[in-house]
Each structure stands twice: as structure tokens, then as C-alpha cells.
Amino acid sequence: MEGVEDDLSKLLEELSSGVVLNNIQEKLNQSSPKLQSFIDDETGSNAEDVRRVLDAATDTESNYGGGANSITNTPNFNSHRGHQHLQLHTELSLDALRPVSENSPLHKSATRPISTSIRLPRLSVCEDDSSSSSSSSDGDSNSSSDSSDNSSEQSDDDDVHLHLHLHRHHRKVKEDEGDSFESSSESSEQYGSPSTLRRQEALKLEKIMQIQEKKKLLKEKLKEQDELELKEKQELNEITVQKEIKLKDKSNSVQNDIVDSDNNNNNNNNNSITIEEQQQEKQQQQQQHHHHHSTPNKPPKSRSVSISTPDSNIVVAGGNVISKERKRSILASFEEGSPMRSSSRLPSSRGGSIKIKVSKVLEEEMQLQQEFEKQEQLRHSARLSQLIRDLNMSSNLQDQQDQQLRKNENSNNNEGDDNNENVSNDNSSDNENQNINGSILIKEEQQEKIEITTTITTVITPPPPAQEPQHQQQPKILTPEEVEEERIRVLRIERMKDQVFSQLDELEDPLYSNGSRQRNGGGGGASTSAEPSMMQIPLTRLEDTASSSSSPTLQATKTTTTTTTTTTTTTTATLPINNKNLNIQGRPRKDSISDHWDIGRKEQPRRSMTLNIQRVGEDFSVKKAEAKKVNPDLEKILVHISLVDQSHKVICITEDFTVKDVIDLFSEKLGLVQTEFFSLAEVTSDGYDRWLDPNRAVKEAGIKNLSKLTFKIKYFKQPKKLSDSKAVHLYYLQIQQSVVNGTYPCSEAMSYRLSALQFYITFGAFDKDKHIAGFLDHGSLSEFIPSNFFFELTDEVIQKRLFHLHSQIKCSSSIEAKLRYLDLANKIPTFGVTSFQVFDGIRESSIVRQKRHLCVAEDGILISRKDRAGYDFFSYKEIISYQVTTRGLKIQIPHSSITPNTSETMSFDTSSYDQSNNIIDLMMGYKYFIQHDEFIRGIGAPVEQVDLNISLLLPLFQPPKIRTKSDPLRSRLELFKLNYLGLCQNFHTKPISKLIDQIDYILDKEGSFRNRLAFEKVELPSLNLRGSDLSFIADALKDTLNLIIEEGESIVENLNILSLDLSNNPLLATDAFEPLKIIMTCNTIIHLNLKNIGLSNKGVMPLVTIIEKYPNIETLQIGKNRVNESGVRVILRAIKNFNVKIETLGFEETNLTDSGCLIIDKLLSNNKTIKNLNISKNLITEEGFHHIFEGIKRNSLSLQDLNISGNKINSKLMIKFIKWLASSETSIITLNIAKTGLESSFGAELQKFLVGNSCHIKSLDTSYNDLGTSGTKNVIKGIINNQTITELSLCANKISSSGCNDLCQSLELASATCSKLYLRHCGLGSSSLVRIANMLELNKTITTLDLSMNEFSKSSSSAIGTMLEKNETLQEFYLADSSLGAREVESILNGLKNNSTIKKIFLDTNPIGKKGISSLANMLNTNTGLEVITLRHTNLNGKDILELLKQLSTNIPIKIINLTENTLDKITPQIKNAINDQIKRLHTINIQY
């Protein structure tokens, strides 16, 4: 028993592995059951050989009870006749004889064997035309001779008792002899050459008429034999009843769980085909004992296998027996190379049998069919053998226990010894082996399911002592505790078996595994035993035929019943049509879309807020309906049904199907339960749907063989309850396709958010390493983004935005993402409409017709406008009438509802009459829904004369939602973007990507619409823009801002441009009016930066006009332009006279002279709002600064930032200015007096100002003056005692070691406030640099340090490296032009490895060279905080750069590496390509070289 548990545990482990999963999970789509598959599975051989034996034994009865229908060899299953027979023929597929479409599943390119795709008329193999005519008569004569031979060999085998009963339903004969002949002729004409097949039919009919008399004689003989056998059985029943009365009192417990095939035979009195291998009297006695559930002490062991029908039980073929020699010859023919395996059988869909030459069947198809059959048989044999082995292990153990119990009880039961002694003596040689009495019931029901019932009765008697092996121990008497322990162990093994088969179910088909697992627990099959030892083993999916769909199932129930003298094991199996465990040929296909549908089994259920979609518990609560089955007697029709995403299935139907039956069958294939929301449509030639009436028959609806249909929603309304996960998925699919193809036009922001959800559903959660630009190609990207949003943008730009939104999605499962998708899409104004392209009935010209879109919705119709985007909506209450015309349709509306794009009577031309009817049909259907809703609310009359199909749908939907005219994510900013991209596309101009990025950042920022974020800054500096590039921006702004919002519409106002930065674009001077045109268009701009745009005196006047027209400008930067003094004076004069809100003026490098300073003096005096004044790097002398000084005195309270650097002002006037600052109350906090000719004496006055109480300076720049060491030391002393300065620049002023020490001491104090320190080119020695490094180890305030252009030594570099390991505040570090070689840099980089606070480091103009590459790469791969590093002019060539990039890892945090200005003149194309490849590899880093 422990070995069984170990084997089952190993089997469970193997089933959980990926290898087993890949081997088992193959989906076979098969069309009909085959007797061949069962025989192959049970015997491990080919069913073709068995059919030859059956033909030989039973061909004489082939048409027994057939009546007139025997002329076509069609069995007549007439219940009034006592006999029936199913003749088995060797058949080949006819698919090879007819050309098929390349898209058809029957095409030879498909991997599925063609012969299994449809059930076709039977084909008998013949060698040539001459022999085909005589094969029928030969076959009949041969079968008769074989039958007689089998009769003579009846006694050759006494061990096996084989009953073959072919189950078939009663079918009334619908065709007379003539009809059957016509059916056979039609089959011949359809599938073969007409002349040849008619000749064969004539010969065939002639032969059939000649043997009719023979068959009648055989029928009479069989009838007599059946009556004799029935009489004998009735006598035996009487004897058995008497025996039962005697044995019933002595039996301790009697079980009622045995399936008695003979009892069924006696009750039904039906036909059967029995081939007996043992004497009939012994077999009947054995069955009588089974019937009364008791057996004598020493019964014989027997094995019987019977194939019977519920309404036939008469022995056919005179009780013929297959001899051992005959069986050996049959088994020998089952070898792999046997020629009998060259064909396969398909159930006939017509009555007749058609004979064709084998040579006419395509060899390619036959080879493919044979190869697939062998592979399937090997796979099935390996799987089934393991299951049977485990089943037998448990059965043998239980039988041994029962044998011991029965042996102990036999001593008390002596009355039955006499009755069974003879039988026991006859079979004493078989006592050591277990004989099986099985009856295999094969039954073809209306669901076309084959039910196989195997009753295994094992009767074990204690062997005589002389025959007991020496090594066998004496049976031990088990105590009740031991019996209970063994029972518990058996139950544990049974549960493990259930887990094994449940795992097999899930591996075979995940769609049915859940339902199968639930139903397996409830029992089923033929056994009704209540014993605890009963176990149910689902060999395949167990399907409840009463309430669920007739999916392929194979059910086995093993019941073990222990009595005083008998052990009976009953196994009932239900063989399905499409059982994957059986050797049935099928098409190995790719996984369909339904295999990947997420049914949303999550702990936290989600409920859609709009479509009332909900889950119950862990799953959707649904019930499956039963689908109609294919009628094998009717012509088969293949139907190609696709979903809206172009995934499809091919199903087989018959002519008796209605459209509703087709929907149910297709839904069963998909696992769909709530079918009431979906309909079938046929796509017409004009691209629109022709909806099929579900109550019509398929031929009336126009469904033909290989018709292509679409399965989708017709009436798109909000369902009251949608509880089927597959229905949710189909809703999602149709909406998603409508969004992508533009049927539901929506805003770009809405579209991208829906696309991000779709991407999440398709590819899962965001992965920053996987989901990057380039993940999707253009074709795949078009399946997510509507085509009208591509414009001239690259795929990388679109994917970058898509992945950004994808990263914001927080969903627990894909089903939740689908529900969010439906909720968001429900806000689209055109949600749920069916769109039709029509044309205006009134043409504007004889050639051009105006295209319009007419959309039918649940509450009215929408008609697209002529002059602009959008729709005019008319509710059904507004519409007076609508009708179909010869050219299309006509719609009449009241005069009050007329819009500029519509008229009182609107005529539209359609592409076809069917399209017009389709539109009217949808409108009428939606009106019925509205009338029903009004009637329910009590405000309308009941609906009269409503279509039956619509009446069934009325209670399923909610009332129409309130229609909105606008998308909630439609915004002014998006409209500006679309207008700009449209202009660029029309004029074939590349859009400015930086502008698009800035717009998308606002649109896609999380919570942007909820928080009402606005687009306020247009920052386009340093892009080498031209005037024409800006003209599109100006035009788009004009169109956007001038858009008038109609009544009932809404738009998010998120476009409010306040700042325009066009600096450092010198090419704009070619057309200076264009940048100014933007300002004139958008009157909200108050901050204007036009620095270095090439503005000359010609462009001054438009700027002056803007200043005069828009007096609210607060910031004006026009520095570094080619405006001379006259132009500056004109601008300043305009500001002085018209602007009263100016705060910032920038006139650096504008050639401003002393005369211009007079205007600045007046401007400062009159305008009290100026806070920032920059007049640096001009031609101002002492006289000009004197005017400015006077103006500052009058505006001392408002001016905060003064930059007069780069002007030749002598030291005396500056000392006077500093003294005034020290003695006056001013607001100046930023003072830049760099490069103004200051001398060392200025240092003392500056020290006094810095230590005074009136000093509020926060930023002081005295760079590039001639202060000397003494003047600089005085400035440092003033800074030491100052508590306000946070930014200090002493660049290009010599600092002594003592001054440096004093500065470091003040910065080491806890009260230090300086955060930015610039000591560039200050002549610092090695000791001073070491001192600064030691200071930085203690300082907690400095974030920016510039030590560039100071010569570093090894010791100072090592000190800097040590400092970097300890410092935790420094963020920007400048070490440019510091004579740092490879060794010095290595010391600094070693300290930088473990520093996580520095974000930027500048190592430009240092001779690092090739030797420093490894240390650089090592630092970059190790550091976790560095974002920017500059290595300009560092003696690196192309090979060095390539080597550096190769050593870099892809997951480093750095963002920018600047390698420009290195010697790359002699770089080869190979190295350049290699560098580009590395840059692609390091795509997350902006590498500049």
C-alpha cells in the first residue's frame, strides 16, 4: 500500500512539472465519435482489423430490419423489428477530392488531418474500376463464410466471454427506397466523377438486388435463434429467483451497486451482436448470480466484454466464437507496418457507401493523417497505461483483503458448496489469476456521446492447499481496527488518485478544469453504492449532461463491494465524442483567444460602476446551457465564425440548425454562458453587417458551407447584470476594437489611457527594463493607438508616452483592467453606436459626393457635420419619420431641431439596399427598448407588435444613459497639440519634439485633469529654430484660442501660456516677426525671453508694438541681440511710457552706452515695480553708472537684483556706491560687481558693508577684479562675520593660505550659511586644497563647490577622494582644467564610488587619457547617485570612448555622459558603428560624443 502512495506522489510531482504540462496540454478539435478510437485504446491496436473481423462475422445481417432502406446500406433502427446492426466499412476522407480555400481549415497547409474536419459519406477502398463492381458481392459472401467459420470455432477459447452490443438510438425511417438512392447519387455527384460514380451505383444496385433473397433467409434464421435464446434466459431467471431466496437469508450484507448487463438485456428485449468464447450456459449462470448480488463460494472466474444497446438484446451470428488462432491472426495484423492501417474511418453523413480508387486520394493527406494518428496513439497509450496501472494496483490490494475475509467465512457457509463445486473444479486452473467479466456498452445518444460501461466482477475462492505456493503465507484474520485502518488507507489513495486525474484535467483544458473538478465531487456514472470505499476517477473532463454543455467527457466510477463470499468491482466509463485521451484524429491548433481569457479569480472583487458587471465570491456565477448536436444523417456545413479581433473558430453544423443553435454551439466552444447579449452577422460586400434572425434555419438565413460570420453585440446597451467573464471579455473586445478603428472617436488623452489599459491587459504590469521604446513595431502599435493620432510622430515618441501611462496603472489583475477599460470607455460620447458611412442625397456637384457618418445609438441617431468635426444628435422622439428609399433612406425631423448641417428632410444614399434595411432595423429595435422603459416607469403605453427576438431582450438592459456631447478628457491643450501636428503634417514639416514632450507631460501627469493642471510655459531654448518653425505654433494657437464651445459641450481649460522662452536661437533673425506673432496671438504671455535670437533694429518696432499693446508684460529679456543704442532707447522709452508692471529687464550685451543710462534713470524713477536689472557687459562708464546710481536711489525699496558686471566703472565710484548701501535701507539681495575694475582698497569698504546691520546681501560676486591677497582677505573677514550670504564667488582673485584657512574655519562652524562657493582660478596651492578637503569633511551646508583651474597634486587629489567618501551634502563638484592625470583622477573616483549624494561632476580639460578609462567605468558601475558627468577635452579618442562604453552596465543610474570636444577626427566607420551600437545598448543614458 505504501508503494501505491509513493507511486501516486511521484505521479503528482511529474504532473506539476512543465514538461508534462507541455506534453499533455494539446487541444484536439474533433467533429464526431469513432468506434475505432475506443477499440484502439482498449486493445492497443488498429480498429480497422477489428472491423474486418466484425464484417466477416456479421455481414450476413448488414441490412437486417432495414426494410426499403437496405438498398443504400443504411441501418433501419425500427423498434418494432427485433434486430439491428451497424455495418462497419473501411472509409477514407473525401476532403482531398474537392478544392478548398486557402483560408479554410480544410486546406492542406493546415496541420489538422483533413479527414477529421467533417463527417462525410463512407468510402470503400477498391483497387480499380473493374474490381469495384464486384467487391460488394464478394464482401457479402466472405462475411457469410467467416460467420460459419467462427461458429465452428466456438469452443476454442473458454477464458474470454465477449459480447459486442452496438448502441444506437431509434431513428424512424424518413426516406423510402427511392429517396435513399437519390441521397447516395447526390453524394456521388458531389464528391466524385459523375460518370464513374453513376456506373458504380448501377453495378452496386444490381448486386444488391441479387442477394436480397439470401438476406431474407438469414434474417429468418437469426430471428428463430434469438427467440430460442430468449426462452432459455427466461427459464434461467426462474431458477435464479429460487436460488436467491435461499441465499438471501444467509448473506450478511448485500450491495446494490452492480451494473447488470444481462438484466438490461432481459428488460429491453433488443438487438445485440454477441461473439461468445465460452459456453453459453456457464455465462448465463454467471450473469444470474450478478443479478442477485451473491455468488457461491467457488464460482468460476470469467471475462466477458459486451457491446449492447438499450433497446436490443438478441444474439446475432448464431453465437459465433472467435478462435484463438483467429485472434492471433488478427493481433498479428495490428503491427505497425500492416497495410490495414492505411485508411481510417469517418461516420457516414449519408446513407450510402461510395467507392473510389485509393489512388485518387492525395498521398500527402494520407501520409499526414497516418503520421498524426500514430503520434496520437503513442501519446494516449503512454498516458492511459499509467492510469490503468495505478487503478489495478489498488484493485488487487482490495481483492486480496476480500479474499481473506471470505476464506474465513466459507467454513460457516456450506449450503452453497454443492451448487458451485462442479463449476469450481472446471476452473481450478484459473484460481491464481483474476478473471474479468466485462460488458462494454457503446451507446450513441442524441449528444453523439459513446457510453462505455465495463462491469468487472472478481470472484476469488481460496485455493486448495496443494495448489498454494510454498512462499505464500497463511491468510491473516483482520481485526475491526485493522479493517478500519486499511479502509482509511484506501480512501487516502483514492483521494490521491482524484488529485492526479484532476491535475490531468487542468493540464488538458483549463477552460473546463474548474467545472469538471466541481462536478467530480458530486458523483455520477452507473454506480449508486454508498460504501465509503467508492471513489470516482475522472479519466478526462467530467461533464454534467443534464445542466451543462455536452463537452467531451470520459467518466469512470469504480465501486468496490465487499460481501461474505463475493468481491465485485464495477467500472463505468462514458466515452466522449472529442476525447483527447482516445486515438481520435484532430487538428493540432494554436491556442485560441479563449484559452487566455482571465476569469478574474481574485480575493478582492471589483464591480464595474457603469455596466453592472460583478463577481460572486472567487468567480463569476454562471450556468451553462446545452447546445444542439450535429445530426449525423444530414449534410454537414462548415461555418467560419470570427470575433471582432479577427480570432476565429470553424464549427460544424447541419441543415436542421437554427441561427440560435449556431450561437449556442459557438458559445459553448468559447466557454460563453450569457449568450443573450450577442448575435451573428454576415459582413456584406460594402463592409457592413447583415444581422441574422436567430429563429430562422441556417439555410433560410443564408448560411452556406464555409460562410464567414461575425459574432458580436447587435444592440449595444448597458446590461442589467453581466456575470459571465467571457461575456465581459467580448464586451471589452468589441469596445476596444471600436476605439482603435475610430468608430468611437474620442480625445487623444482618452485614447492613450485606454491604450495603456489595453497594453496592461495584453502584456501585464509595467516592467521598466522590458517596456521601453522599440518594444512594439509599427504594426503592433497600430493595434493600440488609433491611426488618426500618429501624425508625423515617430514610433519611439508614441511608445514612450504609452509606457509612461502604462507605468501609472495599478491593477490587481487583467479582469480589473478590463472593467476599468469599460468604465472609462463608457464616458465617450459615441459609446455604443453603430456607425454607417452614407452620402448626402443632395450632391454639391455631379462628381463629388459628401461623405457623412450616420450613427445609430440606443437613444437616437448621430449625423456627422460637414464643416467641422463632431456630430449632430437627434433623439428618437425628435424624429418624425424614417423610411427606406430606392437610393438609401430618408429621415424627417421637426423644424425646431434643424442645425447648420442638417435640414428638415434629410436624404442619404447608401451603398446597398441591405445597408438601408440594417439602419432602419436598428432604429426600430432601439425604439422598442425606449418604449419598454417608458412603460416600466409608467409614462408610456405597452409595446405592441414588437419583434419576438427583441421582446426577449427587453428586460435584460438598463434604460439609456444620459448622453453627453463632450469627452471628459477633451481639453484646450490637446486641441492645440492636434492643430499644431495637423499643420505640420499638411506642410510636411517635422514637429518640434520638445514642445510635444512638454504638452504630453501636462496631459499625462497623474491627476492632471483631476487637479486642473495647466500648460503655462513654452520653453524652446537652444534648438536652432527658424521663423517658419514658429509660424505653425502661432497658427495652431490662434485656431485653438478662437474655438467657440457650443451649448451643451464642455472642454477642459488647461492652456494658459504665461512664459515664452525662445533664447539662444540666433536663426530666428531671418524672420523676426514670427516669434513676435506668437506673442500677439496669445495675449496671456507675461514672461518673454528673447535673448540671443538675432534681433536687429528691424525687429524692434514689432516688439515695441507688442509692448504698447500688451502692457502686462512683467519680464523682458532681450540681451545678446544685435540691437544698437538707438534700438535700446526705443524699447526703454516704450516700457517707460506704456508698461506699468515690468519687474525684470535684461539688456546685457546690447551695446548700451552712457546716453542710454539716462532713460534707465528715468525708468527707475517712474516705475516702482522693477525688481531685477541686468545691464552687464555693456559700454557703460563711470558717467553712465552715475545716472543709474541716481535712479537706484529713487527706487531703493523695490530693486532686489542688480547686475552691473563687465562695465568699466572705476573703484572710486564703486566705493561711493558701497558706502551708500551700507548707510541706506535697501532691498538689494543679489549684487554682481564682477569685472568692474575694483582694486584692493575696495576690499576694506566691502568688509564694512558686509558686517553692517543694513546688509541683506545673499549672493555676492566679486570675481575677476584686482583685489589682491589683502583685498580678498578683507572680503573673507567680512563674510566670516556675515550671517546672510549663501552664495559667494571669489573667482580669479588670489587667495593666500591664511585667507583660505580663515574661510575654512568659518565654514566649519555650525552657524555657517554658505551653500555655494566658487573659488575658480584663485591660485590655491596643494596645502590650501588639502585644507578645503578637510573642511568639507565637517561642513554640512555647501552643496556646490568650484575648484576648477587650480593645480592639484597627488596629495590634494587623495585628500579630495577621502573627503568624497565622508561628505554627505555636496551635490555639484567642478574640477575642470585642474591638471588631473589618470592617477589623480583615480584617487578622486575611488572616493566617489561610495558617495551617493553628488549628482554632477565636471572633469573637463584634464589629461585623463586611456589610462583612466577603467577607473571611470568602475566608478560609474558602482556609484548609485551620480546623474551627470562631463569629460570634454580629456584626450580620449574613438577607441577609448568605445572601450569605456563597453565596460558600462545597462542598469547604472547616470543620465548624461558628455564626451564632446575629444579628438575624434580619425575615427573609422567601424568604430563609429560600434559606438552607436553601444549607445543603443545604453539607451537609458544620454551619451554625447
Swiss-Prot record:
Repeats (LRR): which ranges? Answer: 1017-1040, 1053-1075, 1087-1110, 1111-1133, 1167-1191, 1196-1219, 1254-1278, 1282-1306, 1339-1362, 1367-1391, 1395-1418, 1428-1450, 1451-1474
Alphabetized, the UniProt keywords read: Coiled coil, Leucine-rich repeat, Repeat
Where composition is biased (Basic residues), the residues are: 163-172
List the biased-composition ranges (Low complexity): 131-153, 181-195, 277-287, 421-435, 556-569
Q: Which Pfam families match?
A: FERM_M, FERM_N
Query: Which intervals hold domain FERM?
Result: 637-934
Region (Disordered) residue spans: 59-86, 103-197, 252-271, 277-312, 396-435, 459-479, 508-569
GO CC field: cytoplasm; cytoskeleton; plasma membrane
Q: What InterPro entries has UniProt attached to this entry?
A: Band_41_domain (IPR019749), FERM/acyl-CoA-bd_prot_sf (IPR014352), FERM_2 (IPR035963), FERM_central (IPR019748), FERM_domain (IPR000299), FERM_N (IPR018979), LRR_dom_sf (IPR032675), Ubiquitin-like_domsf (IPR029071)
The molecule here is called FERM domain-containing protein C
